[in-house]
Amino acid sequence: MFGLKQFYQSEVRTKLAQELDIKNPMLLPKLEKIVISVGAGAHAKDMKIMQNIAQTISLIAGQKAVITKAKKSVAGFKIREGMAVGAKVTLRNKRMYNFLEKLIVISLPRVKDFRGISRNGFDGCGNYTFGINEQLIFPEVVYDDIMVSHGMNITMVTSTDNDKEAFKLLELLGLPFAKVR
């Protein structure tokens, strides 16, 4: 397999340097980490479902998930401090590139009626976040093992603080953005 990291180092960096007119190669934007997170919502009280959500994310990411806990009690949401409210995984280096390649090549094309991911997920600091409605698009997830169907948020953190540069980086890496109408 050619590998997305090798593709980034051999082709994407040179295209970025030309298009963004950056002379110093150390200033070129790069992908630093990918965070996959799931909020349990109404299922936060059931620890078996929380364990199942964490296990599903671990299968998808290839790395153990961490169960996130509430920092404060919120009476309106019936949440107590320290209560499990979701799960997350932070991917870096080799696992990050493997996950991104699997997402682009295998998982996103399996989304029903897929026309590209939104361009509106940039936060103004060069990071991009988008949501997936269902975890079944990933080949590692077996339908019979799922207790609750849930979506997830995927955040891509880049080294740049500019949305334009981050968009160019992700576009050259092969992320299928929706066409502008």
Curated annotation (Swiss-Prot):
GO molecular function, one term: tRNA binding
Signal peptide annotation: none
Keywords, ordered alphabetically: Ribonucleoprotein, Ribosomal protein, RNA-binding, rRNA-binding, tRNA-binding
GO CC, alphabetical: cytosolic large ribosomal subunit
InterPro entries noted in UniProt: Ribosomal_uL5, Ribosomal_uL5_bac-type, Ribosomal_uL5_C, Ribosomal_uL5_CS, Ribosomal_uL5_dom_sf, Ribosomal_uL5_N
Superkingdom classification of source: Bacteria
Keyword rRNA-binding belongs to the record: yes
Alphabetized Pfam families for the sequence: Ribosomal_L5 (PF00281), Ribosomal_L5_C (PF00673)
GO biological process: translation
Protein purpose: This is one of the proteins that bind and probably mediate the attachment of the 5S RNA into the large ribosomal subunit, where it forms part of the central protuberance. In the 70S ribosome it contacts protein S13 of the 30S subunit (bridge B1b), connecting the 2 subunits; this bridge is implicated in subunit movement. Contacts the P site tRNA; the 5S rRNA and some of its associated proteins might help stabilize positioning of ribosome-bound tRNAs.
Family: Belongs to the universal ribosomal protein uL5 family.
Subunit structure: Part of the 50S ribosomal subunit; part of the 5S rRNA/L5/L18/L25 subcomplex. Contacts the 5S rRNA and the P site tRNA. Forms a bridge to the 30S subunit in the 70S ribosome.
Alphabetical list of PANTHER family matching this protein: 60S RIBOSOMAL PROTEIN L11-RELATED
Name of the protein this chain belongs to: Large ribosomal subunit protein uL5
The organism of origin for this protein: Helicobacter pylori (strain ATCC 700392 / 26695)
